[in-house]
Amino acid sequence: DVLFVPEFTWLNLLVAVWIAGSVIYISRVMIKYYKAVKALKANVIDGTPEMQAKLDLISQKCGIRRKVKLKITDCVISPVTYGFFNLVILIPNREFDDRDFGYIATHECCHIKNKDIWIKLLTEIYCGIFWWNPFAHLLKKDLTYCLELRCDKRVTSKLSENRCTVYYEVLVTQMKAYKEQKESEKSDRETALKSALVGMSFVTNDKGEKIISRMEMILYPKKKQTIINNVVTALM
């Protein structure tokens, strides 16, 4: 029998490099996720019974049938939701009053209800397939922003103007707390952790126009929307 040896062509080489790059990219995402979840197990505690009970009530109102666990940790500066089957809302180890926690939990439950974590996972796979295309990675960043806007819109859609202002104040308070620690080493660890968890965060590291656009959507929901806001509306 003659051993078949494929003929070398530049096309075959490019396809081989493409496949190898995709396998490496997706493998790294999976490994980072596994390590992040494993590391968190040793650095989290359960939320108080009162906070867990309130989260249970909010998740039920959002139409979530599965149990959403509340965990507290020193590893993050701002709340984050993660988990594909075991749903977890992770909050920083600091005091939250009922008002702030209620709006944060509602926002994070909207992410769960909208399957945003799965959308981010599919986006990671897409970026893994087209790892060589910079536009794929820009799409990932903009999509995360759009998903945050969609949750803000859903949370505030049935709120009065005064309560929208309160939600805005909660968001600003969390952004301020995030900014105060942003330059610290803890912030770098948090950014890496959130990225590894493929999670959704209440506060992101967006700047400038994106922050303004997010605030405008909350405070002026009836104002003529920009192109990106129309995308968010379409996603709903």
PLM regions with names:
Residues 1-236:
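Hydrophobic topogenic segments
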